[in-house]
């Protein structure tokens, strides 16, 4: 019988107090209030760890690299305690026939109750011969494992959209998972790679509430993909003020002005980069001085240079510059001063007339 998360933690010598603290941090990482703490604790105490099978198709393994760097919760807690990661040919010790035997065993034992996580995508051209796993095309393995899965998580832009291996003319016919598997609930977690805490947060939510998170129209978790990077960017005030970097390493760049004119795709990209950030919340690309390339959006790889300026953005500040806005402000201030002076003159004249009238 599979142990519960709490049983594993107790076996590791973790106290009840530390367990509740962990549940509190988990609620915070998911954007949930303190009222959810008892519900999370109960789920961790009573629900068995969920078996997860993690497959790899055409990809660069950047999603796995991101995942193992999660800090809230730690990847080791997710892998060793929260879930039962029974198959992942990148992280598991077993290999070859032994690894494939484990896959078959878990699929049989937990039929209909395991989560399938997919990193990368299947190529369909030439019967899928561009990606071979265990001696057979990855497309065959994907369909075989997916048929009895409880739900599917598409890790990264490769599995979610196709990504760079699907770039025109796409000779291998690399195809996102949802276009191959159409009869299962699929949670897309795009990004190249996704943020580590977003990945572990999705898993934590599914284990805690025993359901998939609320998704947007594109199948992404709303808790992490409901806002544009631009909406919470710390450079947003410069955007609204029309203060833009015009050349790399110019004075505006050194002052941390908006990178919109340098091709930043933040205004059209939905992700949690500007709030959750990367490397335990240390930074994100825009904070490091480079514009967002929109890596979590469908088709970003075929939309031209990363340094091409976005067009069609009609918000205040996009076409304005500091001089224009400064000039406008001067006109407004000048008009206000003139109006104030006129009002003061009228008031003085009125008082003078009142004084003259009283003398007579």
From Swiss-Prot:
Binding site for [4Fe-4S] cluster 2: 230, 233, 258, 264
Record-listed E.C. numbers: 1.12.99.6
Residue ranges of the TM segments: none
Subcellular location: Cell membrane
SUPFAM superfamilies in the cross-refs: HydA/Nqo6-like
Keywords: 3Fe-4S, 4Fe-4S, Cell membrane, Iron, Iron-sulfur, Membrane, Metal-binding, Oxidoreductase, Plasmid, Signal
GO BP, sorted A to Z: anaerobic respiration
Membrane topology: Peripheral membrane protein
Amino-acid positions noted as binding [3Fe-4S] cluster in the UniProt annotation, renumbered to this chain: 273, 292, 295
Cofactor binding description: Binds 2 [4Fe-4S] clusters. Binds 1 [3Fe-4S] cluster.
Residues that hold [4Fe-4S] cluster 1 according to the record: 60, 63, 158, 192
Family matches, as PANTHER family: HYDROGENASE-1 SMALL CHAIN, NIFE / NIFESE HYDROGENASE SMALL SUBUNIT FAMILY MEMBER
Quaternary context: Heterodimer of a large and a small subunit.
Protein name: Uptake hydrogenase small subunit
Source organism (scientific name): Cupriavidus necator (strain ATCC 17699 / DSM 428 / KCTC 22496 / NCIMB 10442 / H16 / Stanier 337)
Name of the encoding gene: hoxK
């Amino acid at each position: 019988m599979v142990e519960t998360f709490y049983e594993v933690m107790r076996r590791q010598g973790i106290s009840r107090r530390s367990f509740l603290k962990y549940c509190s941090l988990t609620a915070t990482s998911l954007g949930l209030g303190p009222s959810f703490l008892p519900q999370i604790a109960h789920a961790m105490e009573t629900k068995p760890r969920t078996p997860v099978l993690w497959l790899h198709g055409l990809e660069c393994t950047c999603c796995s690299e991101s995942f193992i760097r999660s800090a809230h919760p730690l990847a080791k807690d997710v892998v060793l305690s929260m879930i039962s990661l029974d198959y992942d040919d990148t992280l598991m010790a077993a290999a070859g026939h032994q690894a494939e035997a484990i896959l078959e065993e878990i699929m049989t034992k937990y039929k209909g109750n395991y989560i399938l996580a997919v990193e990368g995508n299947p190529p369909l051209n030439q019967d899928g011969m561009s990606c071979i796993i265990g001696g057979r095309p990855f497309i065959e393995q994907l369909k075989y494992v997916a048929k009895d899965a409880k739900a599917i998580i598409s890790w990264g832009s490769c599995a979610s959209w196709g990504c760079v291996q699907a770039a025109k003319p796409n000779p291998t016919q690399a195809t996102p998972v949802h276009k191959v598997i159409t009869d299962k609930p699929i949670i897309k977690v795009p990004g190249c790679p996704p943020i580590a805490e977003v990945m572990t947060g999705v898993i934590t939510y599914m284990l805690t509430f025993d359901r998939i998170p609320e998704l947007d129209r594109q199948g992404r978790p709303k808790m992490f993909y409901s806002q544009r990077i631009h909406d919470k960017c710390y450079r947003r005030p410069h955007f609204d003020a029309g203060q833009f970097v015009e050349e790399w390493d110019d004075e505006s760049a050194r002052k941390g002005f908006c990178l919109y004119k340098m091709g930043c795709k933040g205004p059209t990209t939905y992700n949690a980069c500007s709030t959750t950030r990367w490397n335990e919340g240390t930074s994100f690309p825009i904070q490091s001085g480079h514009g967002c390339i929109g890596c979590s959006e469908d088709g970003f790889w075929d939309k031209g240079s990363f340094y091409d300026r976005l067009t069609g953005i009609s918000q205040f500040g996009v076409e304005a510059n500091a001089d224009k806005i400064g000039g406008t402000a001067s006109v407004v201030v000048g008009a206000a001063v003139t109006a104030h002076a006129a009002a003061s003159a009228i008031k003085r004249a009125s008082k003078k007339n009142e004084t003259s009238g009283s003398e007579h």
